Amino acid sequence: MFISEKVQKALEENKPIVALESTVIAHGLPYPENLKVAQEFEDIVYENGCVPATIGILKGKVIVGLSKEQLIELVDDNPIKVGTREISYAIAMKKSAATTVSSTAKIASLAGIKVFATGGIGGVHRGEWDVSQDIIELSKTNIIVVSAGCKSILDIKKTLEFLETFQVLTVGYKTEYFPIFYNRLSKEKIYKVENADEIANIFNEKNKLKLESAILVANPIPEDYVLDNNEIEGYIKTIEKEIAEKDIHGKEVTPYMLKRLVELSNGKTLESNIVLLKNNVELACKIAQSLKK
């Protein structure tokens, strides 16, 4: 594992660091918007007094703190999408890979980083028996993950049941209902926190008890970017039919759904996705700062 000079320096000087994933850049956003947004994420982290650590695998080397040039190279190298399970494969086969929530959380934790910002976690898909690695990884990795909950394409109730079963503490930032996007809030109740200091305190108490699971901080999408639920559900039904007809499954499902949602919504879901990501990065910075108090 290679830790960049800026991240290593921040670790040595005990500065707040926020980990960022590469899958949303390589597979979640279209080119060239993805590279522009990646830079904006890092700028937000710096502006909030923290150090960004974008994580990915470049030609078999795990990198914590990808440079702008390395990120461009990663995107251009047709990277595979890897969860924790596939990290060793990517390394051994000298593959370039974009890291998902599970693999980013694992690598960040191994590097000593305590806070990670993402868009949404993977969960339990509707219909077929498809459960994301993210939940399993969060059950055994000591990190705070800030997300906008999970995508409305998932089975929200079952996702929360899995999080509970695997002892992943899930808290809502200024809400007692689990967020989903692009609809803001579900009807499923969770614990509520009011500020970053409370989240940091919960994490510190958890560590005193040597509980190794993550804390999932669910941060609702800003209200101005919420999309109509009926509209989104209509798109999802159309896409689910396409997925069945084309026999798309496994890791290919989510990227396909996100791409088609952007197309069917005329770009509205893409705009919402970028806004919620930036919103999560800002909250992650506040939490990282609070952990240093």
Curated annotation (Swiss-Prot):
It catalyses: D-ribose 5-phosphate + uracil = psi-UMP + H2O. The active site is at 21 (proton donor), 151 (nucleophile). The keyword Cell membrane does not apply. Substrate binds at residues 81, 101, 132-134. InterPro entries: Indigdn_synthA-like (IPR022830), PsuG (IPR007342). It holds the Pfam family Indigoidine_A. Keywords: Glycosidase, Hydrolase, Lyase, Manganese, Metal-binding. It comes from the Bacteria. GO terms for cellular component: cytoplasm. One of its GO terms (biological process) is nucleobase catabolic process. Its cofactor is Mn(2+). Binds 1 Mn(2+) ion per subunit. GO terms for molecular function: hydrolase activity, acting on glycosyl bonds; metal ion binding; pseudouridylate synthase activity. Mn(2+) binds at residue 130. Homotrimer. Belongs to the pseudouridine-5'-phosphate glycosidase family. Catalyzes the reversible cleavage of pseudouridine 5'-phosphate (PsiMP) to ribose 5-phosphate and uracil. Functions biologically in the cleavage direction, as part of a pseudouridine degradation pathway. This is Pseudouridine-5'-phosphate glycosidase. It comes from Thermosipho africanus (strain TCF52B).
